[in-house]
Amino acid sequence: MKFVSLASLGFALVAALGAVATPVEADSLTAGGLDARDESAVLATYNGKCYKKDNICKYKAQSGKTAICKCYVKKCPRDGAKCEFDSYKGKCYC
């Protein structure tokens, strides 16, 4: 009985080592269509106008609708001042 369990344990260990030691091809991800997108450093900014009372920025989004975001770090200096929304960082700058 001990010999059978020892043999099956040894077989499982050898199979696991074989799976771990199998080399992975470097091009296997790109061949399967799983390559990384080249959009990681693309900065899309949208210009708009800020409003001092609520400290918000209103801008036209990509969909064409008016979007609103709260100004980040600096307060809006006056109504109608220039602001921009950075879609990469997800923050508004007034």
From Swiss-Prot:
It is found in: Secreted; Host cytoplasm. InterPro entries: Antifungal-protein_dom_sf (IPR023112), Antifungal_prot (IPR022706). Residues 22-43 form a propeptide. Keywords: Antimicrobial, Disulfide bond, Fungicide, Host cytoplasm, Secreted, Signal. One of its GO terms (biological process) is defense response to fungus. Its main location: secreted. Residues 1-21 form the signal peptide. Disulfide bonds join 50-76, 57-83, 69-71, 92-94. Pfam families: Antifungal_prot (PF11402). One of its GO terms (cellular component) is host cell cytoplasm. Antifungal protein that acts as an inhibitor of growth of a variety of fungal species. Belongs to the antifungal protein pafB family. This is Antifungal protein.
